[in-house]
Amino acid sequence: MLPDRKEAESFLRESEEIHPGPWADHCRTAAECAEKIARNCSGLDPEKAYIIGLLHDIGRRIETGTHFKHIVDGYECMMEYGYDEVARVCMTHSFQIKNIESYVGKIDVPEEKSEMARTFLNHIELDDYDLLIQLCDAIALPEGPVSMEKRLRDIEERYGSYPEDKRQRCYELKAYFEEKMGRSLYDVIGVDEITLP
């Protein structure tokens, strides 16, 4: 189940008031990118793509939800509202490699929460919506869409590293969606390839 677009936008605005920060504009950028990409892919609903992109980091509405905790908090918050399709993406968006050890940042939750996340990831098959939001997370800055290299450098600067296997997986996602669209990702999202990275 999903909120509608207006509900999702309202929920993000309210969450931004609770815990202001650049995370909310990052979510808006990811949502806009997801909608544009979905419009160019058969079998993907642009409205759903926008909504799940908009709320993928909603766990950051809780002030302490800065590292791994934002994943679990987002999942639990969306499940409380009955938005299981959003909750799923809250859980999967940081795991291009499907294990919690691949997380870039601190595992700042109790063991039972990290075990819940591990079990969740072990028992699902990532679908194209999961993959789409992983891709959009890797090209979205608060100021707007950027090259993947620029966004991954941003993460690396903030967290100290970005593992090569995750970096490679991000580029595989880019290639996967470019093949589905039959177009350059950067053309679709409006990033000028001349100015890359």
Task: Go through each PLM region and give its residues.
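Conserved alpha-helix/loop element of class I SAM-dependent methyltransferases that forms part
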Residues: 33
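Charged phosphate-binding loop/patch that engages nucleotide di/tri-phosphates or the phosphate backbone
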Residues: 161-197
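Divalent metal-dependent catalytic cores for phosphoryl transfer on phosphate-bearing substrates
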Residues: 13-16, 40-155
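A short, charge-rich alpha-helical start-of-domain segment used by transcription regulators
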Residues: 22-24
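Acidic-glycine-rich active-site phosphate/pyrophosphate-binding loop
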Residues: 1-8, 48
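Generic N-terminal amphipathic, Lys/Arg-enriched alpha-helix
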Residues: 5-20
